[in-house]
Amino acid sequence: MHLLGYGIDVNNKELQQFCAKSKRETELDIIRIFSTRNIKNLIQAIHNAGGLAVLAHPACCWALSHDRFVKKLISYGLDGLEVYYPYKRHRGIIKFTTARNIEKIADKYGLIKTGGTDLHDYNL
């Protein structure tokens, strides 16, 4: 869930402390949730449920340029990459990525290529 705070005093000590604490807790949660063991188990659970494991909008969250990372996920059973996603919306945080870059990576490793539910325009 995302909440926006309009008209706030950004120097408010209570708000600053809350944000700092939340940031630390979030970082720990991310490390715990996305540890290697959990990703491997999640992919296995998806397969056991009859599904395909696809990494959603990979360039928004991961250093996809690192072959080692992609190969590791494939070794865990990754089936595909969400290729068709409006990456242009995230130009500020994504330096090199377009759908075509992700498509090339999927082709290189024989992964299926998908689009997400938030893809509303194929003019990527």
Where are these regions (language model features)?
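Histidine/acidic-residue-rich catalytic or RNA/ligand-binding cores of hydrolases
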Residues: M1-G5, A63-K71, H90-I102, Y122-L124
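Extended substrate/RNA-proximal surfaces in nucleic-acid metabolism proteins
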Residues: M1-Y76
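Active-site beta-loop-alpha junctions enriched in small/polar residues
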Residues: I8, P58-C60, P86-K88, D118-Y122
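Helix C-cap/helix->beta junction micro-motif
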Residues: A49, K108-Y109
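Hydrophobic faces of well-ordered beta-strands that scaffold small-molecule active sites
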Residues: A53-A56, L81-V83, K113-T117
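Structural recognition of alpha->loop->beta junctions
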Residues: F69-R89
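Short acidic/histidine-rich active-site segments
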Residues: G110-L124
